[in-house]
Amino acid sequence: MSTKEKLISHVMKEEPVGSRNKVTVVGVGMVGMASAISILLKDLCDELAMVDVMEDKLKGEVMDLQHGSLFLKTKIVGDKDYSVTANSKVVVVTAGARQQEGESRLNLVQRNVNIFKFIIPNIVKYSPNCILMVVSNPVDILTYVAWKLSGFPRNRVIGSGTNLDSARFRHLIGEKLHLHPSSCHAWIVGEHGDSSVPVWSGVNVAGVSLQGLNPQMGTEGDGENWKAIHKEVVDGAYEVIKLKGYTSWAIGMSVADLVESIIKNMHKVHPVSTLVQGMHGVKDEVFLSVPSVLGNSGLTDVIHMTLKAEEEKQLQKSAETLWGVQKELTL
């Protein structure tokens, strides 16, 4: 008799029970791992799968997390074979090529499209009913690519979009007002990154519109220069990259925030990237961030934001830029 047999007597043969809220993270780079640890520490799933083409790095990361199993309630698995991801509820895609110095955005996009041509069909094969969350950059274009390659309905393909931009925005407004970010309500919509659109007309604390108190807010003529806050949001990522080489923690927490709303069916409103054709005068098949309701079925509703003419124009301009890139892609 083995030690195990002496210690434990078997009462019944266990039937394998599938995980009801399994999450997969594709890509174990800085963003993938920050997303994984954030999901684990929020206790969102009973199984977390990780997959990557870099076998040793993947093995090391999985092992490192498994060594902390005592402090977690989640089963952690990892493999370069996508069968490990089977029956996931949410699949978070963080994998992709990094932009090389002097490389055009379009070239980077096409390289990532080629990577997605391998990743997305594999996800669909093993988790045909999952909700796909794209985090890789440029996120709006790659969410469109994932939607096209997966054949999923639009409610099940979401881009992390401006959820992080809005969090940065609220943090900086909070710093200026000496308030917690959760008490500063503010939205950034549109394209994630350089051409994102801050909705100054909607910025409020306890329902008090800040633009009502300072009608010049967000414009060039504002003596308090609130506009600089949006510039800081846009420059924030570049600043972090300059200082530490990459961004990870905030985007990881942002991803876990979105996963939580889906897994727990919270019907929370988040600025995430979705198909905006027909909204705000956008004519093309593009994905941009608008306030959207997230729950168990993915993205169930979109909130109609009251945007000023200038803000709508910025959105349409982003849409045209994205479409210009998308129509050149070979899918």
UniProtKB/Swiss-Prot annotation:
Cellular localization per UniProt: Cytoplasm
What Pfam families does its record include? Ldh_1_C (PF02866), Ldh_1_N (PF00056)
Q: Which InterPro entries match?
A: L-lactate/malate_DH (IPR001557), L-lactate_DH (IPR011304), L-lactate_DH_AS (IPR018177), Lactate/malate_DH_C (IPR022383), Lactate/malate_DH_N (IPR001236), Lactate_DH/Glyco_Ohase_4_C (IPR015955), NAD(P)-bd_dom_sf (IPR036291)
User: CDD domains in the record, alphabetically?
Assistant: LDH_1
Instruction: Provide the top EC class.
Output: oxidoreductase
Q: Which GO terms describe its cellular component?
A: cytoplasm
Specify the pathway.
Answer: Fermentation; pyruvate fermentation to lactate; (S)-lactate from pyruvate: step 1/1
Active site feature: 192 (proton acceptor)
Q: Which residues bind NAD(+)?
A: 29-57, 98, 137
State where substrate binds: 105, 137, 168, 247
Q: Does the keyword rRNA processing apply?
A: no
Q: Which reaction is this enzyme known to catalyze? A: (S)-lactate + NAD(+) = pyruvate + NADH + H(+)
- Which keywords describe this protein according to UniProt? Cytoplasm, NAD, Oxidoreductase
Please list the GO terms describing molecular function. Answer: L-lactate dehydrogenase activity
Identify the NCBIfam families for this entry. Answer: L-LDH-NAD, PRK00066.1
Subunit comment: Homotetramer.
Q: State the name under which the record lists this protein.
A: L-lactate dehydrogenase A chain
Species assigned in the record: Dissostichus eleginoides (Patagonian toothfish)
